[in-house]
Amino acid sequence: MAKNITVNNVIVQYVFLERVNPVSNKFTFDCLIPQDHPQVAEVMAACSAEWLVVAAGAAETSAQSMGTNWTLPNDTGHIHPDVAPMLDPNLQYLRFRGVQDAAVAPEKATKIYANMQQEDGTIGVGEVTNRSIIGDGTIANVNLNAFGYQASGQKGVKFYGQWIQIVNLVESDYAGAGAPPAVIDNGYVAPAAMFAP
């Protein structure tokens, strides 16, 4: 299970990836922070501010469209069923996410490779697929063509909550395994060399 992942210098307890719509090839990265985390307000403010920058002119202004919402720990419709039992049943969790919608250019969909927990519970290296849990939090290779519309030049390919700065994906249950941590500089993609296969 990916634990203790640093995003915007905030320790995030769990991260998982879900393909929301296999037709449009839309992926969602979900991160959960307990409501009593000292930086919850900071995360919400940063997400809201960057959403307004990334999606300037967008009609949607709800908390969900800004990339955050509050989720109960037993809400397996929004929380991975393998993650839900690990959460504190007495807390709500701030769920924030980045969505890569490759409907405009599905052939350029971001592919993420990581040491991940397979369906049988084993840890293996491969492409992170639908509803997989990122096992050790390391990203080995990302196709940058669709990693946010700044890189692709297509507004149809974007991240909701592009502010998420995955500074260091470290201190996981499988620390030291797999590729070195990936870095996304100031919320945008780092040089492609940093994501060499």
Which residue ranges define each predicted feature?
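A short, structural micro-pattern
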Residues: 23-25, 88-90, 138, 153, ...
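OB-fold ssDNA-binding interfaces and closely related basic DNA-contact patches used
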Residues: 1-102
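OB-fold/S1-family single-stranded nucleic acid-binding modules
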Residues: 151-172
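A beta-strand/beta-hairpin structural motif
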Residues: 98-128
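Acidic, gly/ser/pro-rich intrinsically disordered tails
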Residues: 1-5, 170-197
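Beta-strand elements of well-folded, non-transmembrane domains
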Residues: 35, 146-148, 168
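Exposed beta-sheet edge/beta-hairpin loop segments within beta-rich domains
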Residues: 116-140, 147-157
